[in-house]
Each structure stands twice: as structure tokens, then as C-alpha cells.
Amino acid sequence: MASTVTLEDALSNVDLLEELPLPDQQPCIEPLPSSLIYQPNFNTNFEDRNAFVTGIARYIEQATVHSSMNDMLEEGQQYAVMLYTWRCCSRAIPQVKCNEQPNRVEIYEKTVEVLEPEVNKLMNFMYFQRTAIDRFCGEVRRLCHAERRKDFVSEAYLLTLGKFINMFAVLDELKNMKCSVKNDHSAYKRAAQFLRKMSEPSSIQESQNLSMFLANHNKITQSLQQQLEVINGYDELLADIVNLCVDYYENKMYLTPSERHMLLKVMGFGLYLMDGSNSNIYKLEAKKRINLTKIDKFFKQLQVVPLFGDMQIELARYIKTSAHYEENKSRWSCTSTGSSPQYNVCEQMIQIREGHMRFISELARYSNSEVVTGSGRQDAQKTDSEYRKLFDLALQGLQLLSQWSAQIMEVYSWKLVHPTDKYSNKECPDNAEEYERATRYNYTSEEKFALVEVLAMIKGLQVLMGRMESVFNHAIRHTIYSALQDFAQVTLREPLRQAIKKKKNVVQSVLQAIRKTVCDWETGREPHNDPALRGEKDPKGGFDIKVPRRAVGPSSTQLYMVRTMLESLVADKSGSKKTLRSSLEGPTILDIEKFHRESFFYTHLLNFSETLQQCCDLSQLWFREFFLELTMGRRIQFPIEMSMPWILTDHILETKEASMMEYVLYSLDLYNDSAHYALTKFKKQFLYDEIEAEVNLCFDQFVYKLADQIFAYYKVIAGSLLLDKRLRAECKNQGANISWPSSNRYETLLKQRHVQLLGRSIDLNRLITQRVSSALYKSLELAISRFESEDLTSIMELEGLLDINRMTHKLLSKYLTLDSIDAMFREANHNVSAPYGRITLHVFWELNYDFLPNYCYNGSTNRFVRTILPFSQEFQRDKPPNAQPQYLYGSKALNLAYSSIYSLYRNFVGPPHIKAICRLLGYQGIAVVMEELLKVVKSLLQGTILQYVKTLMEVMPKICRLPRHEYGSPGILEFFHHQLKDIVEYAELKSVCFQNLREVGNALLFCLLTEQSLSQEEVCDLLHAAPFQNILPRVHVKEGERLDAKMKRLEAKYTALHLVPLIERLGTPQQIAIAREGDLLTKERLCCGLSIFEVILTRVRAYLDDPIWRGPLPSNGVMHVDECVEFHRLWSAMQFVYCIPVGAHEFTVEQCFGDGLNWAGCMIITLLGQHRRFDILDFSYHLLKVQKHDGKDEIIKSVPLKKMVDRIRKFQILNDEIFAILNKYLKSGDGENMPVEHVRCFQPPIHQSLASN
């Protein structure tokens, strides 16, 4: 029975599923993550040598020697790491200032305690180099013995001796370079001597020896040379080693970059060791033992090679320091100065790209066929030739990767040895430090791009080959097995037959040993009936040997044994007078040599994943222990600006080069390489910690810069898309080109959801989203802040900025999961929980403090313009915030273009501004603003204006009749001028009183224009909503067609868009209710003819409750005719005042106050119901009528009559227009016919003569 699972366990299991990384479709632009395939190490270091009892005993003995030498090489590598990564301890230890210091004993004790383990390591290092030199010289002595000189020495053995030479060269250079090692030893020695730690003579002597060993430069080389020179014929053996290296280098018999560089170092150091007091390399060349011309050519091509970490060696230095260089100087071209083309990476890019393209195409063909056919096809179905193709492809790929990695390392090495200066590079400052001159200022832009591109090729190809690792591994094992078995069982059969037949026992024993060592017979044993084993010919039908096929590679010892025994057959030395080679036929020799060459790479290929990693390893680009040592403790670590991985990454970001943008993660991967190397090869935690600290800093910088760039890029696109096309065209005609942003490849980076860096999986998309969201919010915030620091006209610019941010958000939302722009806008506008936001508050603020008191309305243009004579004090605003272009319109050019567009809206407030206010404030904001404006109007009407009305009513004549026509217009003008003398001369009338009325008028006009704009917006909404509400336009009907049939077809066509039935069918009850309400509101909004302005007028009417506005009840019970007690009579007096023409240098009322003044007066008259009386009884209108009749023109009391009448006529037209608009809004609810209740019946008037009767 299945075990029961509790609910908690089940839920936790489901939660765990979230942690499973699911394969996604993100583009692959990052290097291969650490392989999860187990990497077995089949290299036994000859531990299994005793199993091969069938092999030749000499070579088994040689394998034993090999094994111990490999162990020594490994130990030497550990000492090299120890020296290279040594950091000075003594600098961190407090120093004893004087002998009287009380705590000096304690300091010395601590010094000894800390430094003793380190000094022990140095002591062990000194012993090791002695042992290693003795061991190496012992091997040389053994091989140079007179009786063994003719003996065959295998290439593998010579190569191991070559590795020893390389080890000595590296260790000596490291020891020379590290001053901190000597300082630490000196500090220890001082402390130990003070504490009398070293009392025994032997330990004192050893300490002295160590001091001398560390102090003497080239001590290891000197010891080695001294011991070698006493060995007779050592130069011959070294010549063999150098020749082997020349041969390997020339024929590319190496795979990893370190092997390539090792061959060159062995050539150089080998020549230096050979050219001593007892031997001369130039004499050896004369004997044709070595070819110096060839070596010179190699050293000329590649002048500098990596020695260890960031230490480099100039190969010519080995030649220059050799004993017989001076007299043979002219032979060498490599010692002359001048750069090799090898270091000009830009020139080699064409060749590298071609190689990359060719190989990638070939690899893609196989990769695709594996994907297409791999699932349905068994591996066994592949033919030998197909496996061979894959084998060749794997080898070719590794060689290419190795070649490119070596290329990068060689350029880097050259640059480290040849730092720049202020003369070569103008950007390099005088005080730049050595490492900075070697890295930061030492590469041109083209060189950086070339390095990035090669790096991307290496890492990209590593990914592709890594994906096919299992396919390659199988093909490699299968091919090696086939090649080995075919060669041993088939190819060697004929030579074996010949050897048996001709009784060549040595050759026969070697061939049989090879076959016994490696053959895997189909039947499990060698066929005993094979005629070749008896030296006989095959029968006429032939002798059939079936070679089996498996995917199993040979062991490392097996391969070594086979290759060494084969080599012994074709070698020029054999230990006897006659070589074994002479016993073999020509074709056999060629077959053996061919197999021997091919099998060289088998070891590398059998460890495919490890070799792949080594061929792509560029970890040394980060390590800088040598240069840190040169700073003598001034630097603990270099800043990121000097670090190669960041230099390359930052260069891509700074140049914004589109073709390189996708490679940016590859240069960051150098940190992965370095961290892996620090942990697995150097095994130093502190180095890893330093790399990690740099990565933390660099990645923050990377995300910061990248997100800023991406935001700016999409902002520029948004700004360009929304820029008026006519302006762009006009600018182009004028020769000022506003360019479109060049396309960049940020999309690929935006899709990266798991970037691998130092074992972390980073969601780059999420990090960029956070920064872009912040930038968008900052942009919105800035747009509103700019609006808050400017007047009402800048509402146009605010709307433009918000539109561009909206468009930027829309473009970015394709790749990033951003908050909705409306939510961001509400947050920036402080409108999340508050009922109204910053924009609404500022709009009202501007209306109240600047717009109402300082703007003049012009009914002809329908615009408000700033008054030329301000009555209120200057309004102080905050300074607009400074901002980078990407937070405004995107770029400087776009900022300029948009500024020029919005400058056209700067000098007025009109319908465009008010429409923008409507769109930005919405119903809620408009309601708030209007409510506040009504409060302003109320305070004015019930405050200052009321006081002025009361004051002016007192100076008005109690009775002022309209004079008869017979007086003529000049007389009437003089009469009114005299009657209204006090009003005309009232000082504050044309300033404070008119100013207050203008504010009321402007407030009213703003409400009216807002409603008009709102209506247009609502009509637009309605038209947009119509298709979704089943409101369809009437279709054109031709003759003979039926309207209802056509309409039904149209309805059927758009039925899928009809929203309410759709939500009623699919939505929740809450959604259905919302949909119905929305539908109803949209349909009814304009249909029911609601009017804001009418409500506002009604509200204002309630403010006019003081009796002064209407005056006392008329004595005749109908209306006041000649009495000046109602507001319209006061307004007539005011109108008479502002109709008087002004002097040449005075401002008119229109210039000072605009039409707002007239709107205020007319509104009060209309709301008081005094409109018609005003029309009939107005003083100015009466003068106009009389002047129109008599046409006189005189100057009365310095008032030109004709000019005054012209002004009266203009104001009469304006007043009529205002009354018409006001009456339209006030009577909109009254219908056409006035109700009967409003009609009053009066007795007909009776003539006075009859009245007395």
C-alpha cells in the first residue's frame, strides 16, 4: 500500500517546485555555466604500470621515473603558487620602535608565532629546489652516460624534462620578483634572534642559507647551471629537448595556451643553460644539432609570453643574457626592438572572424542534425566516418579556442610589458601608476572592441561545444578505440608477419608487446590460426579479422606504453649500432609515424570537458600580484578602473556600441574564470574574496549604467515618435537635423532572467526593472516639479512630458514588468490617498495668485494674456529643478525641439491650456478648482466689491434723468460729465475696484471655458465608446435597399464588441454592475444637458443678497426710472468712466483689465435681473443714440465726443454678446415660453390732466 502523505508535506512539495529552474526562451548571450557532468580523471600517473607485464620492461621502468617526476612538477607548481600569491605579512605586524619599548618581547613573540609557519614553507621551498635540481641533473647524468648516449629516449620523457626546465625558470623569476618574501623572512629572523629561538648552530646556518638563497637573484638558475656544466654531453641532451620543443611548436603539437607558451619558454631557457662556459650554442648550430634561425623566427613572432599570472617574460632576454651573445649579436633579429604583428589584434580580426564563421557553420550543421535525428537514432547506427567527423570537429574546435585564448593572453602580456605614457596616449596623466599605464590607458577603443569580440567568440563557442559534450565524448571514445584497434590488429599485422619471417626478434617482440598491451580481440583472444603469426602468407580467400567497435578509450598508461613502443620502432636512436627503423619497410614507418602524431591529442580529447575549460580559461586577465608587489604596500588592491574585465565591460557601456552590447556579459564572465582559478588552482580564499568584492561593486555599476542607458534610449525613441513631424521636416530644410536614435540591442539583455556570476543566478531583468521604474517615477516627479516652479502656461509642457513618459512606459513594458503608469503618476502627483494631487493644487494656486489678478481676457481671440500693468505684487516661485536630458524629453536635441514647440504656448492661456487642465485634473480636480474659485468670487462680491458699491452709491447723484435729444450730444455729454463728476474723479475706481471686478470676471470666464473644453473631451469619449455600446452610425442606403436590413447586418458585425452583454455573460456580479453603470453614465453624460456654468451662476446669484444691489422698492410700484439706487445705474456710471478716451501715453481699460471687467459687471446685472433696464437707461447708450442722430463731434471738458462714442459702440457690442451668453445658460432650463406667474398686470397710465379729475 502506498504511504500516505500529509497535507503539510504535500504543500511543501508543491512549494519546492517553484525552485526548479524551468528552461526558458531567453537568448544565450552568456558563457557556459559550470558543467554538472562529473569530470572523471583517468590519469593514473602510471600507478597501474605494473599491470602491463606484456610491455617492454624498459618502458615500464621509464614510466616509474616519469611518475615521480610528475609528482615533483606538481609540488613545484604548488611552490610557484605559494610565491606568486604571497602577500607581505611583516607590514601588518607592529614594529618595535626602540629597545626600551616595554611590549617589545610580546611583539617579537607574536611576530614569530605568525611568521614561523610561513618561514617553514620557504625553508621547504629551498630544500625542494635543491632536490629538484639534483633529481633533474641526476636524470641528465644518467642519460648522458657514455654507454647510454645512443639509447632511445621517448618524446614524452624529453617533454617531462622540458617541463622541469620550465619549472626552474618560473620559480626563479617568482623568487626574484617577491621582495615581500625577503622582508617577511628578515622580520622573522630579527624576532627569532631576539628571542634566542635559533640556538643550535645547524638552525642558524640553515636560516643563513635561506637568507642567501632569497637574497641572491637567479640562485636556482645558477645552481642548475653549475651542476649541469660538470656533466659531460649535457648540451646534447638539452639540444634534443629544445629540438623537440621546436618540432612540437612548429607542427602545433600542443592544445592548451599554457602548453604553447611552455614550449617557447623551454626553448629560451634551454638555450640559456646550453650556452655556458663548457658549451656553445653557436658551435652546436654549426654541427647542425640545433636550428637557431628557426628559434629566432619564433621569438621574433612572439616576443613576450606569460610566465606566471600577470608576470611576463621577454623571450629575447634568455638570448641576451646567455654567455656568448655579445660576439653573436648580429645573428639575432628577435633582440631588436619593434612590435610583432602578433600583437596587433585588430589586424587579425578578419582572419579570426572567418575561422569562427567557418567552424560555427560546420558545428551548427552537426548540432542541428543531432537535435533532429538524435532522439530517434541509436548511437550504434552512426558510421565510423561520422564518428571520425565529430572527433575532428571536437579537435578543431579546441584548437581554435586555444588559438584565440592564446591570442588574447599574448596581447595582454605584450601590453603589460610595454605600458603606455603621456606621450603615446594623451589621456594618460603624469601621475598614473604602472599598472594603470599597462591596462587602463594602454588599449585603443578598437583594441578593446577586438578583445571583447574574440572573448565573445571563445565563450560563445564554449557554450555550443559544451552543449554537445556528451555527443563529442561518445564520438571521441569510439574513434580512438577504432583507430587504436584497427592500427594494432590490422595495420601492424603485416610488419609482424615480416619480422617473424625475417627473424627480426627485437622488432617482433616490440610489435607483439604493442598488440598484447592494447588489442581487444573480438573473440576475447588473439586468433591462434592467424598465418601472420607464423610468418606465412594469407590464404587466397584472405584471412578475415573482425575488429569490434566500442566507445571505450585506452587508459593513460596504456596509451603511453603504445606510443613509446611505437616511437622506439621509428626512432633514430635505438641503443645498438643498427636502428630498428632500418628493419621496417617504408610504408610501415609512415603508418607508425602518422598514428604516433595523431595519437598525441588522444589524452586531451579523452578529457574533453577539462580540456575545453582549459582552452577557454582567461582567468589570468584579473590576477595582478606582480604589479601589487611593485607598489611596495602602497596599494592593497587596485580600483576597478584598472581591472581588465571591468575596463572591457565599461567600454561597451560607455560607447553604447550596438554591435557589442550583446557581448557585455561575456567580459563579466572573466570574473567567473578568475574566481574558479583562485579556488581550484591557487586555492586561496583571500583572492576569491577580493574577486567577489570587485564583482559586487562592478555588477552594481553595470546594472546602474545599463538601466540608465536603456531608460534614456527608450525615452529618446518615445520623444522622437511623439515629436511633430512638420517641425522635424522644417528643421531639416533649415539644415538642423534632429536625428533618430540609432538602433541598439538592449532587448537581448532585457530578456536575461538568470545570469550566472560567481555561482549566483541573477535576474537581470528584475534589477533593470527596479531601476527603470525608479527612473520613470523620477521623470514624472520632475515633470510635476517643473510645472510647480512655473506659471499656468507650462501645463502644456507638463502634458507633453507626461505623454512622453507614458510612451516610454509602453515601449519598456514589452520587456519589463513595470507598475502601471497611472499608479506611478498618482504616486508622483501625491494623489494616492489624498483627494487631489500636486497638479490640482498648483493649478488653483496659479489661478488664485497669478491668473485671476494678472491676466486680461480677449473675447476676439478667446485667450487670456498677461496684463501690461500689474496691480498685484510679483508672485515668487521656486527655482525649476535641474535635470539630465533623459529625465525630460530624452536628449539635448529633443529638449531643444520640444522647448521651441512649447514656447509658442508661453505668452497666453487659451483653449489648448484649458483642455490640458481638463485632461490632467479630471472631474474631481475640476470640481475642486471650481469650488475654490467660487469661494474667491464670494469673498470678493461680499467683501471689497460690496464696500466699493456702497461707497460709490453714496457719491452717485440721487436722481439722474436722461436728457432730451434737443440738448444735442455735446450737451448731453457735458450733463453726464457734470452729474457723474464724483465717480469720474474717484481715485480707486480704475485701480482696486476694477481689479477686483476683473478677478471675478476671470474666474467666471475660466469656468465657462473649462466647461466648453470638457464638453469637447466628453464628445470625444462618446465617439470612442460608441462601437462598444452598440451605437452605430446610420448607413448610406442606395435606391431599392432597406435601411433596417443594412443596420441589422452592421449590428451583427459589431456584436462581438458590445461590452455589456459580453460581461453579463462572462463576468462576476460586481463586474456586471460596474459595466452597466459605466454604460449608463457614458450614454447619459451629454444627453441630459447638464451645465456646470449654470450651476455656478446660480451659486453666484445667492452671493448677491445685500439690499444695496437691488435698492429699495420703487415708489411707483413698478421700477426705478430716474433714481440711482440699483446696481445697473452704478455700472452705467462705471461704463461712462471707462468709455472716456485716454491720453496718448495712458493704458486703456481693455489693456489693463481685459474683458473680464465687463463680464463681471454684466454677470451681476443679469443675475440681479436688471439687464433690460440697463439697456434702456444706460447713460453711455443714451449718448450714443443722440450722437448717432446728430453726428456732432466736439471736445467737451477735454473729452473728444466722436472717440468716446466709438468706444461706447464697441462696449455695447461686447455687452450684448455677454448678456446673450449668460441668458442662454440661465434660461437653458426655462424652456421657450415664460410661465404665466411671472407676468404682472399694471393699470394703464393716466395723463396728469385727467388724474386731477
UniProtKB/Swiss-Prot annotation:
InterPro entries found in the cross-reference section: CYRIA/CYRIB_Rac1-bd (IPR009828), Cytoplasmic_FMR1-int (IPR008081)
Record key words, sorted: Actin-binding, Cell projection, Cell shape, Cytoplasm, Developmental protein, Differentiation, Neurogenesis, Synapse, Synaptosome
Localization per record:
Cytoplasm; Cytoplasm, Perinuclear region; Cell projection, Lamellipodium; Cell projection, Ruffle
Q: Name one GO cellular component term.
A: perinuclear region of cytoplasm
Highest taxon of the lineage: Eukaryota
What GO MF terms are annotated?
actin filament binding; RNA 7-methylguanosine cap binding; small GTPase binding; translation repressor activity
Quick one: a GO biological-process term for this protein?
Answer: regulation of cell shape
Which segments of the protein form a coiled coil according to its record?
none
This protein's record includes keyword DNA-binding: no
Read off the Pfam families from this record.
Answer: CYRIA-B_Rac1-bd, FragX_IP
Function of the molecule = Involved in formation of membrane ruffles and lamellipodia protrusions and in axon outgrowth. Binds to F-actin but not to RNA.
Family in the record: Belongs to the CYFIP family.
What's the protein called, per UniProt?
A: Cytoplasmic FMR1-interacting protein 1 homolog
**Gene that codes for this?**
cyfip1
